[in-house]
Every structure is written in C-alpha cells, then in structure tokens.
C-alpha cells in the first residue's frame, strides 16, 4: 500500500505543566514540543510528537534543533521517493546521524497515518496484543521529604502499579529509606538520570536494602562499561535509559552485562520501528523492558500506549494519566488510568482524536511543507 503524503505541518506548541517537575538535571514548568501532522491525498492525518526539551539537559537534541532537522532534512527525505511502509523510514533517515527525537516525531506521524489507512489500531499495526497496560508514575524531586510522601500517597491511592522517585547526590539513601518505611509494600524504583559516577558505588549499594525494582541510569548518559562494572556489585537491577539510543546500544549493553532491564523511549531510540526491534531483542535475551516517559502531551502518550502493547513490555511504564501533567491535554478523550491500568483504544491509528481547538490554543507558530515544495 503506497503512503501518499501530500503535505506535512509542523507546529511549535508550549504547554504549562500543572506542577513543576524536578530531576537531577533541571526543573520544568512548561513543555515546548513540536507536533507533526502528515496529511495524505485523501485528507487523512497522521500525528507525531517530538519529545525533545527546550534545552539540552536530557540529550543534545532540543525543540529548536528538532525543528531545524525536520525542516531542512527529514521532511525533504520523506518526500524524496515513494513510501510503502513506515518501516522503510529508518533506512531512509540513516544518512542523518543521531537526531533520533526528530526522526521519531516524523516517523510516528507516518505510522499513525499508515494504521488509519489500514483501518486498524496503531498497536495492532505494530504487532501488539494487550487490551490494557499497567502503568506507574514518575515523581520529581520535591521540596521536602514530607512533600514527597504526600505525593506518593496520592498516587498510591489512585492505584498506580509502580512509583518512581527521582534521586541525586544528597537526595537518595535517606529519602528512599523514608519512602520505604512509609510504603513498605509499594513497588518502588529510583531514577538517577546519570547523577552518579562509579566512585559512588558504595552509596548506590546502600540502596540494596530497600528492595527496589531497579535503579535507572545511575551513571553517565553515554556509558556502558562502568555500568557493567557496577551491576555485579549491586543486588538491585540496573535499568538503562539514556545509554540506549539504538538496537546496537541495547545489544552491546546486554552482551557486556551493563543492565538487567531496559527502558525504551520511542524518541530516544529514533522511532517506533527501532523501539520494536529493541523490544524483540530483549525478549530473545529474556530481559524485560518498559516504556519511559518524556513529559509527553497526548499524541506522544498515545504512541507510548501503542508500543507498550507488545508482549515483553512486562513492567509498568511511565505513561501516567493526562491529568497528571496537564490541565487540558491535546487529545480527546484524554488518557485515563483506572486501578493502575490504561485501556488500549481500538479506533484506527493512535486511537484518540486530536483536539484541534486545544492544539490551536497552545500553538506558538506553524509551517506547512508540501510535497512539491518542501521549503
């Protein structure tokens, strides 16, 4: 089936978070993002979302660099020759090094359009089978431990299946001890966002007593070797996030023993197809995966739900309810969590309608790129 995309619209959105979100590398009050709309010859739209932040805290990509890459390189490559399947795009984009979040945003829009043309949910087009997915919640660094415990209590009461607490030097062992004392039976993990070095091994070993599901990305964002040295010293499984940008990164990490769990983020690895390949590799190796979050708006959240329906996404992901982050999301219905579960939509494509009124409300500027004139 040919995918005949006539034009692409890039929209720069700015959305206000309901509450500040703090990690080891910064505090976020607003989220900028690029919404990608790919429209075919029959007027059917597919939607994708860039998950890059406004500054290069998480990776070298930013909203501005993503816009540049999409405008100058990726959209022209999309239009450069006929396309029959979204899985062709990674090879087409391979000449562009890195810039995975920009690639994923455009590829995601094409996948959504492709599934809609087939008349099937995106999850089915990807090979997913689950009808509902388990979800956890990610909680940023709070002003005080008392504040953190109060936030956790609220989300435990809402039924979230796993609590993730951000940590950094000075906000780690004692904090996790207080959390575990208050919530002895809650599935709990810690996320360091690369805040430590191998010299901190003894401090990280001190987390073993709390029965954590995992510690996420304790060491440098580009490291595999020191994680492989650290993992045998810990009872707690290491989960890699920032270090895994591709199938080959995942293969090397598993070969080295750098981790026991992998967090798959669609944007970080360059799109849905690469995410699926990493999922399949981990399934073959007996390594569980889960879907991480990047403060996505509704379109990105919908893509996360779709990929999580693959069988080896065996651990609760970060795809919390829309209301966890936004007063009003850009999709309808919004993503809702009931008893720690999200019911997977069965409508074609991402399964949610994009609320164009809300999109217009949040849009700062936009640009249209036609097949016949990509500038």
Curated annotation (Swiss-Prot):
* Cofactor dependency: a divalent metal cation
Q: Which reaction does it catalyse?
A: (1R,6R)-6-hydroxy-2-succinyl-cyclohexa-2,4-diene-1-carboxylate = 2-succinylbenzoate + H2O
**Isomerase among the record's keywords?**
yes
Binding locations of Mg(2+): 191, 216, 241
Question: Does the record's keyword annotation contain Metal-binding?
Answer: yes
Annotated GO biological processes are: menaquinone biosynthetic process
Q: What is its EC number?
A: 4.2.1.113, 5.1.1.-
Pfam families according to UniProt: MR_MLE_C (PF13378), MR_MLE_N (PF02746)
- Catalytic residue positions: 166 (proton donor), 265 (proton acceptor)
Top-level taxon of the source organism: Bacteria
Pathway in which the depicted protein is active:
Quinol/quinone metabolism; 1,4-dihydroxy-2-naphthoate biosynthesis; 1,4-dihydroxy-2-naphthoate from chorismate: step 4/7; Quinol/quinone metabolism; menaquinone biosynthesis
What keywords is this UniProt entry annotated with? Isomerase, Lyase, Magnesium, Menaquinone biosynthesis, Metal-binding
Give the molecular function GO annotations. Answer: isomerase activity; magnesium ion binding; O-succinylbenzoate synthase activity
The record's listing under NCBIfam families reads: menC_lowGC_arch
Q: What does it do?
A: Converts 2-succinyl-6-hydroxy-2,4-cyclohexadiene-1-carboxylate (SHCHC) to 2-succinylbenzoate (OSB). Also acts as a N-succinylamino acid racemase (NSAR) that catalyzes the racemization of various N-succinylamino acids, including N-succinyl-L-valine, N-succinyl-L-alanine, N-succinyl-L-methionine, N-succinyl-L-tyrosine, N-succinyl-L-serine, N-succinyl-L-isoleucine, N-succinyl-L-phenylalanine and N-succinyl-L-leucine.
Cite the HAMAP family for this sequence.
MenC_2
Family that this chain belongs to: Belongs to the mandelate racemase/muconate lactonizing enzyme family. MenC type 2 subfamily.
UniProt name for this protein: o-succinylbenzoate synthase
User: What is the originating organism of this protein?
Assistant: Geobacillus kaustophilus (strain HTA426)
């Amino acid at each position: 089936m040919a995918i005949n995309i006539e034009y692409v619209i890039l929209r720069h959105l700015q959305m206000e978070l309901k509450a500040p979100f703090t990690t080891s590398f910064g505090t976020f009050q607003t989220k900028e993002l690029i919404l990608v709309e790919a429209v075919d010859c029959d007027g059917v739209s597919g939607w994708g979302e860039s998950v890059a932040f406004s500054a290069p805290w998480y990776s070298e990509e930013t909203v501005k660099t993503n816009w540049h890459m999409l405008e100058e390189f990726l959209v022209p490559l999309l239009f450069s020759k006929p396309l029959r399947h979204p899985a062709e795009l990674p090879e087409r984009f391979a000449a562009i090094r890195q810039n995975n979040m920009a690639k994923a945003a455009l590829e995601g829009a094409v996948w959504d359009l492709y599934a809609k043309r087939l008349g099937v949910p995106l999850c089915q087009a990807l090979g997913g089978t689950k009808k509902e997915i388990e979800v956890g919640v990610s909680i940023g660094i709070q002003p005080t431990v008392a504040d953190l415990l109060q936030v956790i209590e609220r989300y435990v009461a809402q039924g979230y299946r796993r609590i993730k607490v951000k940590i950094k030097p000075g906000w780690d062992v004692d904090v996790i001890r207080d959390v575990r004392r208050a919530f002895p039976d809650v599935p709990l993990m810690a996320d360091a966002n690369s805040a430590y070095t191998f010299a901190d091994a003894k401090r990280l070993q001190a987390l073993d007593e709390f029965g954590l599901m995992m510690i996420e990305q304790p060491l440098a964002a580009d490291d595999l070797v020191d994680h492989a040295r650290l993992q045998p010293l810990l009872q707690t499984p290491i989960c890699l996030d920032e270090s895994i940008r591709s199938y080959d990164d995942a293969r090397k990490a598993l070969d080295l023993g750098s981790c026991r769990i992998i967090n798959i983020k669609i944007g970080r690895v360059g799109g849905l197809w690469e995410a699926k390949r990493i999922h399949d590799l981990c399934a073959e190796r007996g390594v569980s995966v889960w879907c991480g979050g990047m403060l996505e708006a509704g379109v990105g959240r919908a893509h996360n739900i779709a990929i999580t329906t693959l069988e080896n996404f065996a651990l609760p992901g970060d795809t919390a309810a829309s209301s966890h982050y936004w007063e009003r999301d850009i999709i309808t219905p919004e993503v809702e969590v009931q008893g720690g579960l999200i019911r997977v939509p069965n409508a074609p494509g991402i399964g949610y309608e994009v609320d164009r009124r809300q999109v217009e409300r949040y849009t700062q500027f936009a640009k249209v790129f036609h097949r016949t004139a990509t500038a």
